[in-house]
């Protein structure tokens, strides 16, 4: 999923189209396109907080990831990415190289059971509750990471 402004960037547009990215210009269309993509057997990576966070600040999640998962009726697997030392964050210029080589770590969590959320009505409440569950999960992961 790519923010709509990048689709208008002449330097990026061709790469975005060729890579098969989905635009976030219209949320309803984005959710439909993502659900169709998942139901077609493809995978999808969604960063509910956006692609780059500011270290030390609390997460602010968008509801798109939850809305997509519920619309596609798919498996939702949380993945935590950590980077030491911190680099490529929103408050740091991309060309600022860390003083030592950085290491990326990926931790794949257990699948999240969506059945309880599918039963909630209205749908908007289910999306909000699932988003909150994701926020709680990743906040706990961040705290666990920061303690080590």
What does each of the following model-derived ranges do?
Residues 1-27:
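Catalytic core of membrane glycerolipid acyltransferases/transacylases, capturing the structured
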Residues 6, 52-53:
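Short histidine/acidic/glycine/proline-rich micro-motifs that form metal-
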Residues 10-13, 36-43, 54-121:
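A cross-family acyltransferase "interaction/gating" segment
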Residues 24-27, 58, 127:
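A conditional alpha-helix N-cap/helix-loop micro-motif detector
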Residues 30-34:
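Short acidic active-site motifs
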């Amino acid at each position: 999923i790519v923010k709509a402004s990048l689709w208008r960037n002449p330097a990026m547009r061709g790469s975005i189209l060729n890579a098969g990215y989905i635009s976030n210009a219209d949320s309803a269309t984005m959710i439909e396109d993502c659900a169709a993509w998942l139901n077609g057997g493809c995978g999808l990576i969604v960063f509910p907080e956006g692609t780059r966070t500011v270290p030390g600040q609390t997460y602010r999640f968008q509801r798109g990831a939850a809305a997509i998962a519920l619309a596609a009726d798919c498996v939702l697997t949380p993945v935590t990415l950590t980077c030491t030392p911190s680099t490529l964050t929103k408050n740091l210029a991309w060309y600022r190289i860390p003083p030592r080589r950085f290491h990326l770590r990926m931790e794949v969590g257990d699948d999240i059971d969506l059945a309880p959320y599918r039963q909630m009505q209205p749908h908007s409440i289910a999306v909000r509750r699932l988003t909150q569950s994701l926020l709680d999960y990743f906040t706990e992961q961040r705290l666990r990471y920061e303690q080590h």
